[in-house]
Swiss-Prot record:
Protein name: EF-hand domain-containing protein 1
Functional summary from the UniProt entry: Microtubule inner protein (MIP) part of the dynein-decorated doublet microtubules (DMTs) in cilia axoneme, which is required for motile cilia beating. Microtubule-associated protein which regulates cell division and neuronal migration during cortical development. Necessary for radial and tangential cell migration during brain development, possibly acting as a regulator of cell morphology and process formation during migration. May enhance calcium influx through CACNA1E and stimulate programmed cell death.
UniProt keyword annotations, A-Z: Cell projection, Cilium, Cytoplasm, Cytoskeleton, Flagellum, Repeat
Alphabetical list of PANTHER family matching this protein: EF-HAND DOMAIN C-TERMINAL CONTAINING PROTEIN, EF-HAND DOMAIN-CONTAINING PROTEIN 1
Source organism: Bos taurus (Bovine)
Length: 640
């Protein structure tokens, strides 16, 4: 009878039990892959996961397999070929041994230190057995550092031997160019390399430190005498109490400077000062809130600190004799903070109350700092050069493109072709100028003066235009405010100074008398009196001389007779053409004379109802010189 292999019971119904630990009842897999090849493996477990003893090697089989010599199976092994030769500069390329060392340097003539410890790195280059010594840079050491010994092979004795990596170890001294270096440690690569070459390394040592450098690293000890002032009490009493002052900084003395407004805050809790700039809309400045951060402000520095550059000075209590306090901020007084002068012009109500209670100062009025309009700048004209009119020359200074001066158009229209003519003589110390006569014409439309000298035959003086039409400045007036001659300045007996020449007015024409009569308010009593005296002299009968009778000039008598003859002929055929205006158009200077060519041109344009012989005789009598004709007397013959 078959029994159960587990517990030995007969394999009968009711005696067979199910093993709950067995879950896999498939057949073992015998096909697989190894190194890419399909292989067959013997199953090691059966159905249900029971291990099969049939396919397992025994211990004896395993021992037999282990005792087999591979040579018996595979034969004698071939000897490996020798490795290729590699030179030292290739094998040890970029392989460097690093040692940490130091040397001691004497410091003579120093009270603070007698020697100095300088830490270095010694580099040994395996490719060519060269060495270099590098000193790490220490900040603010004051000595040249960096490469002390450049890369080279270094001698170790007087026989010419050089240092080799076998001579280097931890805890030894080496001498290089008279300096003794103490090697204290090496890096990890150096330690591994030396140990691989069979060198036993000494234990590492502690790096020696420079005593003076370590002393400088220690914080300075301050010995401060305790004060009776209690800062904690000040902090608790004046916490959140701030004095506010309004100030300005006037920088107009510098180029492109201006006045800026600031707010100065003084914190009573710790006596610190803060300055803020007041910005306006569209002022074109960066809107940074603070000009100066909150800090204590030194007022008086010690003398030693003044010689030290302030740009690198760290201000402490040792450099400051006096700090700014609340009593230094007074309304109406300037205050210099860090080289910038501020003028305090106002404060807030809390500050006024604090000053009244603390210092007894109650008079802190607000100072008006509003911008005042500067007075208008008076334009300074360059000196007058004497050419042209002053108004015309001044236009070059008013605009880039000069413009003509403004003219009184209404005056020009009302006084068009109105000319005041005067007979004048030249006041001169020279006898040849005594008999010279001039015609002064004053143009009412433009206030200009022209002077014409009638030519006199055989006088030796060339007549004609003496002064072109221009404005004449009165003597004594300045170039800035020139005063020109006006109609009221011309009267009989008046002296007119024209550019250094003095003219005395002797007579006037009838139009001047009519103009003075209609505009008597413009003239002085002296001018009116001179005209009245002149009229009386003309109307008075000529006095009879004893034994003599005034003889009339025959030339004048003949001219008057000729004019009477022509006017008698014009009674039947009167001349209605305005000949005078035709001559005045060509006589720009209003001198009463025109040249001969112009005279005949004008006469040819009119049909004069007079005999040609009378006209030729009248032209001969009105001629002055070879080229000038007096058209005044000529026109007088044709006037009704």
């Amino acid at each position: 009878m078959v029994s159960n292999p587990v517990h030995g019971l007969p394999f009968l119904p009711g005696t067979s039990f199910k093993d709950l630990t067995k879950t896999a009842f498939h057949r073992s897999q015998t096909l697989g892959y190894r190194n890419g090849y399909a292989v067959v493996r013997r199953p090691t477990v059966g159905i249900g996961g029971d291990r099969l003893q049939v396919n397992q090697l025994s211990q004896a089989d395993l021992d037999e397999l282990a005792s087999k010599i591979p040579i018996l199976t595979y034969g004698q092994a071939r000897q490996a070929p020798p490795a290729a030769f590699v030179p030292a500069h290739v094998a040890f390329d970029k392989k460097v041994l690093k040692f940490d060392a130091y040397f001691q340097e004497d410091v003579p003539m120093s009270i603070e230190e007698h020697y100095r410890i300088r830490q270095v790195h010694i580099y040994y280059y395996l490719e060519d057995d060269s060495m270099s010594v590098i000193e790490p840079v220490v900040e603010n050491s004051g000595i040249p550092q960096g490469k002390l010994i450049k890369r080279q092979r270094l001698s170790k004795n007087d026989r010419g031997d050089h240092y080799h990596w076998k001579d280097l170890n931890r805890g030894i001294n080496i001498t290089i160019y008279g300096k003794t270096f103490r090697i204290v440690d090496c890096d990890k690569f150096t330690q591994v390399f030396l140990e691989s070459q069979g060198i036993e390394l000494n234990p590492p040592e502690k790096m020696a430190l420079d005593p003076y450098t370590e002393l400088r690293k220690q914080p300075l000890r301050k010995y401060v005498t305790p004060t009776d002032f209690d800062q904690l009490k000040q902090f608790l009493t004046f916490d959140k109490q701030v004095l506010r002052f309004y100030a300005i900084w006037d920088d107009t003395d510098s180029m492109f400077g201006e006045c800026r407004t600031y707010i100065i805050h003084y914190y009573l809790m710790d006596d610190t000062v803060e300055i803020r700039e007041v910005h306006e809309r569209n002022d074109g400045r960066d809107p940074f809130p603070l000009l100066m951060n909150r800090q204590r402000m030194p007022k008086v520095l010690v003398e030693n600190a003044k010689n030290f550059p302030r740009c690198v000075l760290e201000i402490s209590d040792k450099e400051v004799l006096e700090w700014y306090t609340a009593k230094d901020f007074i309304v109406g007084k300037p205050l210099t903070i860090l080289g910038r002068t501020f003028f305090i012009y106002d404060c807030d109500p809390f500050t006024r109350q604090y000053y009244q209670e603390k210092f007894g100062i109650s008079d802190l009025p607000r100072i008006d700092m509003s911008k005042k309009e500067p007075p208008p700048m008076k334009q300074e004209l360059p000196p007058y050069n004497g050419f042209g009119l002053i108004e015309d020359s001044a236009q070059n200074c008013f605009a880039l493109i000069p413009k003509a001066p403004q003219k009184d158009v209404i005056k020009m229209l009302m006084n068009e072709n109105k000319v005041l003519r005067y007979l004048a003589t030249l006041e001169s110390p020279f006898p040849e100028d005594k008999g010279r006569r001039f015609v002064l014409s004053y143009f009412l439309a433009t206030d200009m003066i022209s002077i014409f000298e009638p030519p006199v035959r055989n006088s030796g003086i060339i007549g004609g235009k003496y002064l072109g039409r221009t404005k004449v400045v009165k003597p004594g007036s300045s170039v800035e405010n020139p005063v020109y001659y006006g109609p009221s300045d011309f009267f009989i007996g008046a002296v007119i100074e024209v550019f250094g020449h003095r003219f005395v007015i002797l007579d006037t024409d009838d139009y001047v008398l009519k103009y003075m009569e209609s505009n008597a308010a413009q003239y002085s009593p002296e001018a009116l009196l001179s005209i009245q005296n002149h009229i009386r002299k003309q109307e008075a009968p000529a006095p009879e001389l004893d034994g003599q009778q005034a003889e009339e000039d025959p030339g004048v008598r003949d001219l008057e007779a000729l004019i009477d003859t022509i006017q008698k002929q014009l009674k039947d055929r009167p001349c209605r053409d305005n000949i005078r205006e035709a001559f005045q158009i060509y006589d720009k200077e209003a001198s009463g004379y025109v040249d001969r060519e112009t005279f005949f041109k004008i006469c040819g344009s009119y049909q004069l109802p007079v005999d040609d012989s009378l006209i030729k005789e009248l032209i001969r009598m009105c001629s002055h010189g070879e080229d000038k004709i007096d058209y005044y007397n000529f026109v007088r013959a044709f006037s009704n």
